[in-house]
Design a protein with these regions (language model features):
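Zn-dependent metallopeptidase/amidohydrolase metal-coordination segment
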Residues: 157, 164-179, 184, 243-278
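Midchain, well-structured core segments that form catalytic/ion-binding scaffolds
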Residues: 3-186
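Acidic, glycine-rich active-site loops and adjacent beta-strand->loop/helix elements
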Residues: 33, 217-218, 273-277
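C-terminal structural cap/anchor segments
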Residues: 175-231
Length: 278
């Protein structure tokens, strides 16, 4: 039913060496439910990349620290469950850091209850990395992760409780002189998908990143007068003695790809019930 678009934003930068007397800490966020970035995007679940960017933003300011690396997510069409970042500190600036992280963990759990439960935010000492992200690049990257659209953008005006347009901040990799962000955008409306892609492109361009769009495919507009749909409904009713549920879903289907190749083809999509596909 839905059209999708893959967005990849990239940036290369020259690494800097941390001060020799610095110390490093790894902050890890885990325990989120994750899920399918289409079917479950409307459930208000936490996005690990978004949440950790928020944590890193505050820690970088409060503790005058520097970003060495950031990594979260592994699939474009899955809401990321985990993310981690390595930050570098002056030894004297780490006082109160563990308590700060513990309080932040409690805050996030309170914000997302009861949708999420058992979110963990931990911090641990790690070996001092050989390089850190330059301050300007660091700020631009964290700011763009904070600012970019994530989650439901708009519902379908004529179909109550059904998502029209959404995006998923799926994968973030920063480190080794490179930064890469991958987002999956979805919409049942071509023009809204284009608007979302343009908005995301503009956002990442302000951070100095190069943006490429790929992997787009057509949606599949439902036909309530479809002969095969009516035949299928009658067959289902005879077999099970009840009316089948005919629904629009916020996810890509093979029918969209096939329909783009063979215009006007009468199609339906049916199968077993799917719960928590990711």
């Amino acid at each position: 039913m839905y059209k999708r678009q893959d967005l990849t934003a990239t940036l290369e930068y020259k690494e800097e060496a941390p001060a020799a007397d610095s110390v490093a800490r790894k902050i890890t966020l885990k325990g989120l439910r994750g899920g399918h970035s289409g079917l479950e995007i409307n459930q208000g679940r936490g996005n690990a990349n978004k949440l950790l960017a928020r944590v890193a933003h505050d820690v970088l300011i409060e503790f005058d620290s520097q970003l060495a690396s950031f990594e979260g997510g592994n699939m474009r069409n899955a809401i990321p469950r985990e993310a981690c970042a390595v930050l570098v500190f002056n030894p004297e600036d780490t006082e109160g850091l563990e308590e700060y992280i513990k309080e932040y963990e409690a805050q996030i759990n309170a914000e997302y209850a009861p949708i999420e439960s058992g979110i963990t935010l931990t911090i641990e000492p790690v070996e001092l990395p050989a390089a850190i992200v330059p301050a300007e690049i660091q700020d631009n990257m964290i700011n763009v992760l904070m600012a970019c659209q994530d989650g439901v953008m708009r519902m379908i005006p004529t179909v109550p409780d059904t998502v029209e347009t959404s995006s998923n901040l799926a994968i973030v990799i920063i480190g080794g002189g490179k930064a890469e962000v991958r987002i999956l955008a979805r919409s049942s409306c071509d023009t809204m998908k284009e608007f979302l892609a343009d908005s995301l492109t503009a956002c990442f361009a302000m951070a100095g990143m190069k943006v490429e769009l790929s992997g787009g495919y057509s949606g599949w507009q439902p036909n309530v007068d479809s002969p095969i749909l009516h035949a299928m409904k009658e067959s289902y009713k005879k077999q099970f003695g009840t009316e089948p549920a005919v629904k629009v879903i916020h996810a890509g289907l093979e029918c969209g790809i096939i329909g783009a190749i063979i215009p006007g083809l009468d199609m339906i999509s049916f199968g077993p019930t799917l719960r928590s596909p990711h």
